[in-house]
Amino acid sequence: MEKRLQEAQVYKEEGNQRYREGKYRDAVSRYHRALLQLRGLDPSLPSPLSSLGPQGPALTPEQENILHTIQTHCYNNLAACLLQMEPVNYERVREYSQKVLERQPDNAKALYRAGVAFFHLQDYDRARHHLLAAVNRQPKDANVRRYLQLTQSELSSYHRKEKQLYLGMFG
């Protein structure tokens, strides 16, 4: 168990190095390998193996904390990588950011990335929700402010069109 945690940590660090080098596909591969090392160790997730008989020893609280930290960092870093790769898979960015926010609801980077994903998925209300939370944590971040402004603009445009539609129907 300890060995798998260490291997996951090594893969995560290799992913971080690849990210810094701009090798996003390689980084994604390393983060996925790290997560694969952790598969089945997380007691908070159901495991199909539990019905097959006794499991190995339970994780200590410290090991569980290490596991969750590695998972959270990998998911956050996966979202960052995917935003750098063309074409961007915004659905995956949303999914990975949400996994981070389940454990760290105040994570400003995950809030921003989720907001960007929701914006591009045209879910402007949820984009606004996440971007407002991000701007509250990082008020000087120009990227967060820019996406919040774009989202507000899209929402205003949507509401104007909706109003015109209803005026035409009931006017």
Curated annotation (Swiss-Prot):
TPR repeat placement: 8-41, 72-107, 108-141
Sorted UniProt keywords: Repeat, TPR repeat
Presence of the UniProt keyword Endoplasmic reticulum in the record: no
SMART domains: TPR
Coiled-coil regions listed in the entry: none
Alphabetical list of PANTHER family matching this protein: ARYL HYDROCARBON RECEPTOR INTERACTING PROTEIN RELATED, TETRATRICOPEPTIDE REPEAT PROTEIN 9C
Family: Belongs to the TTC9 family.
Protein name: Tetratricopeptide repeat protein 9C
